[in-house]
């Protein structure tokens, strides 16, 4: 808490007496939903709060009315303000050098021969930007074809983890261009204290009580609710999760697994795929004689319900095969809910035995031959170790709660938006110095 207070005071002093002599255009899929969207919004809001002259520019993906309408009213208003850009003396601001941040999949960038699909121009046309930053990430052990050329065509590249820095450098990106800038999480919204006062929390608790076994009228207070939040794709390891779940638990265990998912280049018939896997796993002998532990599938919930689900879960389980960062991971941890997640790729930047349950993996395996990134490798999460980690949460709830408390502390101390704004401001001031912006170009307040 003391560290955050110092940073807050530093930002206040900076905004009052040392305003940045740059203007920033942050190009990202601000109205599409998804990981890049939430990350870019958190960065832009934090920088605006630090008095950086920043404008949000939609880029890299389509517009989702469903996503925008699902935002709380305050979040909608903040996003509109970012898209409109700062008020005041716009003519004077336009005289400042422009830093353009291209925050998306690099195939959308207007570099190295142009974008791979129609997208708004980033960098802006006509050489309007004095400096171009690329922000991106990936989830396998190497870069897709063509990425290195695109990444080397911008002035510098911000990646979220040291793991990513190594992968990008090995993939041909100039190491001098690479900077590690972690991803912020909204610790004010994803706060267990805020969720406790939310009406959605009571509704979710009642719904979970109806779903659990035994039924609500007989349900004990000790039911262990596990949550997994993911897009329905092989990379997310839902097959690993369900195999470990049904091998470890039956209907005799006081447990419930909630899958909060959405289609991603896949069928939306999630129930059929779950039923097929259950029949294959439990269809012959042994566990077949036992009723399977319950699984509930949910889709398209509000932000308030998502927060309430995090709050009600004993743990969030994410045995994925690779992550650029891990947005559900840090949201859950910010809520004080421990995470079971594969100990490879993005989550290694923030997950430890101290604040969660790192999951072992059985080496790296090649992606299927028909996959878009065939030849790449990702992790194969251990089913046996996942069973152990699930059981540990059930058998030692106090330890799980302690890990969750430390997870919340770590998110607030290291990944809160104001903490990351401080980091980004440092990079922007370095860029400002490299551009030799005269002191007189910084307007008085």
Which positions does each model-derived feature cover?
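Aromatic "clamp/platform" in nucleotide-sugar-dependent glycosyltransferases that forms part
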Residues: 321
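Conserved donor-binding/catalytic core segment of Leloir-type glycosyltransferases
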Residues: 25, 209-236, 242-245, 257-259
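A short, well-ordered alpha-helix in the C-terminal region of glycosyltransferases
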Residues: 392, 399-414, 430
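Short beta-strand->alpha-helix junction loop in the catalytic core
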Residues: 181-196
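Extended catalytic core of nucleotide-activated donor transferases of GT-like folds
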Residues: 25-27, 65-169, 305
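C-terminal alpha-helical cap of glycosyltransferases
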Residues: 203-204, 417-445
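Nucleotide-activated donor-binding/catalytic signature segment of Leloir-type glycosyltransferases, i.e.
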Residues: 268-304
């Amino acid at each position: 808490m003391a560290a955050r207070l110092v940073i807050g005071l530093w930002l206040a002093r900076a905004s009052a007496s040392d305003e940045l002599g740059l203007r920033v255009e942050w190009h990202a899929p601000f109205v599409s939903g998804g990981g890049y969207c939430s990350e870019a919004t958190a960065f832009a809001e934090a920088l605006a709060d630090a008095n950086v002259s920043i404008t949000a520019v939609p880029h890299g993906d389509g517009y989702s009315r469903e996503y925008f309408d699902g935002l709380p009213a305050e979040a909608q208003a903040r996003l509109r303000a970012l898209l409109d850009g700062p008020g005041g003396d716009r003519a004077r601001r336009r005289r400042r050098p422009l830093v353009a941040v291209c925050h998306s999949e690099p195939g959308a960038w207007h570099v190295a021969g142009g974008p791979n699909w129609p997208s708004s121009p980033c960098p802006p046309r006509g050489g309007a930007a004095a400096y171009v930053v690329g922000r991106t990430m990936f989830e396998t052990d190497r870069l897709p074809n063509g990425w290195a050329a695109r990444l080397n065509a911008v002035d510098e590249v911000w990646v979220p983890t040291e793991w990513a820095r190594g992968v990008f450098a090995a993939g041909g990106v100039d190491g001098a261009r690479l900077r590690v800038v972690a991803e912020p999480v909204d610790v004010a919204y994803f706060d267990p204290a805020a969720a406790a006062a939310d009406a959605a929390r009571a509704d979710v608790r009642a719904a979970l009580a109806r779903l659990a076994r035994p039924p609500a009228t007989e349900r004990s207070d000790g039911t262990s609710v596990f949550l997994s939040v993911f897009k329905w794709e092989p990379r997310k390891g839902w097959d690993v999760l369900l195999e470990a779940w049904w091998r470890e638990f039956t209907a005799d265990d006081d447990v419930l697994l909630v899958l909060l998912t959405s289609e991603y280049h896949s069928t939306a018939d999630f129930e059929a795929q779950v039923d097929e896997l259950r029949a294959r796993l439990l269809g012959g002998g042994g566990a077949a004689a036992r009723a399977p532990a319950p699984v509930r599938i949910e889709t398209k919930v509000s932000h308030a319900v998502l927060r309430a689900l995090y709050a009600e879960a004993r743990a969030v389980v994410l045995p994925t095969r690779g992550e650029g960062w891990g947005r559900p991971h840090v949201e859950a941890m910010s809520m004080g809910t421990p995470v079971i997640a594969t100990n490879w790729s993005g989550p290694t930047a923030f997950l430890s035995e101290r604040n969660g349950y790192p999951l072992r993996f059985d080496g790296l395996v090649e992606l299927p031959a028909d996959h878009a990134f065939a030849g790449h490798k990702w992790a194969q999460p251990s089913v046996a170790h996942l069973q152990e980690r699930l059981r540990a949460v059930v058998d030692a709830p106090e330890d799980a709660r302690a890990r969750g408390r430390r997870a919340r502390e770590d998110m607030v101390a290291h990944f809160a938006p104001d903490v990351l704004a401080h980091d980004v401001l440092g990079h922007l001031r370095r860029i400002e110095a490299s551009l030799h912006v005269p002191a007189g170009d910084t307007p008085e307040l």
